[in-house]
Amino acid sequence: MESFAYILILTLAIATLFFAIAFRDPPKIGK
């Protein structure tokens, strides 16, 4: 159960980083 919580927090952190970069710059990753 602890590993599941760790993966969930890690996913949230990566998603936050991705959205921060995506909204800071014009989306260049899709192309």
Swiss-Prot record:
Gene Ontology CC annotations of this record: photosystem II reaction center; plasma membrane-derived thylakoid membrane
Subcellular location: Cellular thylakoid membrane
Coiled-coil regions listed in the entry: none
Membrane topology category: Single-pass membrane protein
GO biological process: photosynthesis
Keywords for the protein's UniProt record, in alphabetical order: Membrane, Photosynthesis, Photosystem II, Thylakoid, Transmembrane, Transmembrane helix
Pfam families xrefs: PsbT
Main location: membrane
Taxonomy, superkingdom: Bacteria
Transmembrane segments: 3-23
SUPFAM superfamilies: Photosystem II reaction center protein T, PsbT (SSF161029)
Main function: Found at the monomer-monomer interface of the photosystem II (PS II) dimer, plays a role in assembly and dimerization of PSII. PSII is a light-driven water plastoquinone oxidoreductase, using light energy to abstract electrons from H(2)O, generating a proton gradient subsequently used for ATP formation.
Alphabetized HAMAP family for the sequence: PSII_PsbT
NCBIfam families: PRK11875.1 (NF008825)
Quaternary state and interactors: PSII is composed of 1 copy each of membrane proteins PsbA, PsbB, PsbC, PsbD, PsbE, PsbF, PsbH, PsbI, PsbJ, PsbK, PsbL, PsbM, PsbT, PsbX, PsbY, PsbZ, Psb30/Ycf12, peripheral proteins PsbO, CyanoQ (PsbQ), PsbU, PsbV and a large number of cofactors. It forms dimeric complexes.
Family of this protein: Belongs to the PsbT family.
Protein name: Photosystem II reaction center protein T
